[in-house]
């Protein structure tokens, strides 16, 4: 779905003026006219992740709150991707093929977990505990878990 022209518009919104080297589709799913896409964008200086959700079925406010929560975790030393802002918001809109989509852009922080071990589960539990404490101490509530749960 994302071609070089759309990626240039997205990067421009987030004030990134770099040569686009490669666009890789990590995930695309369209079910019941609802769309979710995740793309890796490699520029001359960065590896970025761009998430695309249709506006019709996914709340911009929900995506913004999830992004705010992720950045709160980031500022509290929980390993999560740093998100980029456009006009003081993490989520922006872009018209693609006569339809509006919610767009977020973040740093690429590495591959997903490939090997599961007991040590990894211990570390995961510790991180969940820290996340809960940060959320409780900041009285931060999103109201919903994951945007992807809407499409599955």
Regions found by a protein language model. Name each.
Residues 46-141:
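ATP-binding pocket architecture of kinase catalytic cores
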Residues 145-152:
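Active-site catalytic-loop/activation-segment of kinase and kinase-like phosphoryl-transfer enzymes
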């Amino acid at each position: 779905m994302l071609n070089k022209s759309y990626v240039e518009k997205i990067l421009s919104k987030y004030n990134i003026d770099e040569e686009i080297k490669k666009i890789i589709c990590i995930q695309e799913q369209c079910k019941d006219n609802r769309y979710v896409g995740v793309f890796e964008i490699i520029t001359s200086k960065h590896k970025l992740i761009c998430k695309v959700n249709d506006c019709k079925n996914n709340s911009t406010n929900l995506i913004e709150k999830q992004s705010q929560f992720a950045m709160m975790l980031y500022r509290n030393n929980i390993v999560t991707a740093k998100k980029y802002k456009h006009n003081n918001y993490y989520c922006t809109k872009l018209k693609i093929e006569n339809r509006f989509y919610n767009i977020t852009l973040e740093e690429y922080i590495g591959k997903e977990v490939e090997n599961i071990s007991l040590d990894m589960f211990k570390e995961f539990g510790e991180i969940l505990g820290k996340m809960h404490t940060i959320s409780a101490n900041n009285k931060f509530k999103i109201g919903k878990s994951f945007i992807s749960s809407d499409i599955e």
